Each structure stands twice: as structure tokens, then as C-alpha cells.
Amino acid sequence: GFLDAKDKRMKSTIDAIEKKLCKKGLVMRYTIEDDFGKPVNSFSVCTFWFIDALYRSGRKKKAKQYFNSVLQYSNHLGLFSEDIDLATGELVGNFPQAYTHLSLLTTAILLSGQGSRRPVCLPHLKHAVKPK
């Protein structure tokens, strides 16, 4: 990111997100009423981004708690939708949601301790950045 995750400004941003947008272990996109009314759903991809931020800021235990919590909302196949209804836990919106699953995977890799490794690039991929 443009700021180190342990920077005090990032930590205060993470705290504000947790205080104002986290409900039942999930993160809402926003809480302001719009053309559709007052939001009642969390936004799944934001939840995984929030967990990443927690982990990178050094709050690894809390990040893992949030991660384990959000996994409880997947369906019987482990799939997620774009949104989760905060009142019922129902998966709503686009289903299955590709961006959510991409974020789920990157968060799982990060929390496993493998996320800090630099990717190994194959020499035939000229556009790839080679590790130092």
C-alpha cells in the first residue's frame, strides 16, 4: 500500500472501519442511506480486505478471529455471495462472487504465513516481475 500497515494513520483507519462498518464480524461498504435505502448487508470482499489490513498491521490474532467468523457464512460448498444479509446471514447479491473468492484465497494465503513470500516467476513470462 501507499502507507505501511503499521503506520499510525493506517491503524487509526482500521480502527474507524472496525468501529463504524463492522457488524457481526462482517464489514459493510457504507452505512449512509442511498437510493436503495439504508444498507442492511455486508460487502464480502471488504470483509476480506479488512482482515488483510488487520493482519498486516500486526493484529494477527484478531485477523484470524475475523477470518474464522466470516467462514461460517459460506454455503454448504464453501461459496460466498457478493453480500451477506446482516439480520439473517443469508447470502445475497451476485452468487458465486468471483472477487469475493479471489479475496478469500489471498487472505487465506496471507494468514497461512505464505503471503509474504515473493512470487516465483517463470522465465517465459516476460511481463512478470522477477524476485530479487
Walk through the language-model features, giving the residues of each.
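Extended glycan-interaction surfaces of carbohydrate-active proteins
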Residues: 1-43, 65-116, 120-132
